């Protein structure tokens, strides 16, 4: 699919599909791309509240996204250079790598497992609660109460801006380049 437009009237575009490549396309339907396998997107504009649920093996590059519940319960995501705005994104994702992205989203990465976020900006409250084996490397993390109830959490060379009440009941190994407003040491 190339140089196309799927408007908001295209409610449930591309379900149960495999081996799809989508380039320079607008995906504006509410439930685009569900339960698909082996998907590549490049240069796409996505406005879809329930985009990418239960997707397996998706590569996304140079895309802009507005979504709620983005990529719910998906795995093997390889994302590069995304601009994303929304909430409740990346919940329950597994085995994924996200690089050179800007995410402005609350409640992101809840219950994520085996995920690496690298060279990115992640802005939003309640980041990555209940995650397991998630690594943030060379990232800027902005927002209240991030990274609570985590197991095997790693922060490598990260900045934390306006972050308070961090790391509640988390198992964390961190190298942080900035001060942190507060750390919640409740056990």
Which residue ranges define each predicted feature?
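Long, distal/terminal scaffolding or interaction modules
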Residues: 1-187
């Amino acid at each position: 699919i190339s140089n196309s437009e799927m408007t908001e009237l295209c409610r449930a575009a591309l379900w149960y599909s495999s081996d799809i490549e989508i380039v320079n396309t607008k995906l504006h339907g509410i439930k685009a791309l569900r339960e698909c396998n082996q998907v590549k997107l490049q240069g796409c504009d996505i406005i879809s509240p329930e985009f990418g649920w239960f997707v397996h093996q998706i590569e996304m590059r140079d895309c802009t996204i507005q979504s709620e519940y983005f990529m719910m319960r998906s795995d093997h995501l390889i994302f590069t250079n995304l601009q994303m705005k929304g909430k409740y994104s990346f919940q329950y994702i597994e085995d994924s790598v996200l690089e050179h992205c800007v995410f402005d989203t609350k409640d992101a990465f809840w219950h994520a497992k085996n995920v690496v976020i690298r060279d990115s900006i992640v802005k939003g409250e309640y980041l990555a609660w209940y995650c397991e084996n998630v690594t943030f490397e060379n990232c800027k993390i902005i927002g209240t109460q991030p990274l609570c109830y985590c197991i095997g959490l790693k922060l490598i060379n990260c900045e934390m801006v306006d972050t308070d009440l961090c790391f509640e009941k988390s198992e964390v190994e961190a190298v942080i380049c900035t001060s942190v407003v507060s750390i919640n040491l409740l056990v």
